[in-house]
C-alpha cells in the first residue's frame, strides 16, 4: 500500500496554482479514538515543501 501512495500523483493547490505531484514522504496520522488520515509531503517546483492530507482511513 505504501508504494501505491508514493507512486501516484496527487493534485496540490498552493498559492492559487495547481500542481500534479508525487509525494516525497507519507505517513498515517491517527489521534486516539478518531479515524486516521494519510499525510504526505510534496516538493513544489519552486523548492517549497507543502503538507497535505491525501486519504482518509476507515474507522
From Swiss-Prot:
The keyword Transit peptide does not apply. It comes from the Archaea. It is found in: Chromosome; Cytoplasm. Keywords: Chromosome, Cytoplasm, DNA-binding, Methylation. InterPro entries: Cren7_sf (IPR038647), dsDNA-bd_Cren7 (IPR020906). Monomer. HAMAP family: Chromatin_Cren7. This is Chromatin protein Cren7.
Amino acid at each position: 500500500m505504501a508504494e501505491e501512495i508514493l507512486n501516484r500523483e496527487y493534485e496540490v493547490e498552493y498559492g492559487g496554482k495547481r500542481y500534479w505531484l508525487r509525494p516525497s514522504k507519507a505517513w498515517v496520522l491517527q489521534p486516539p479514538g478518531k479515524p486516521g488520515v494519510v499525510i504526505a509531503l510534496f516538493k513544489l517546483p519552486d523548492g517549497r515543501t507543502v503538507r497535505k492530507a491525501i486519504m482518509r482511513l476507515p474507522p
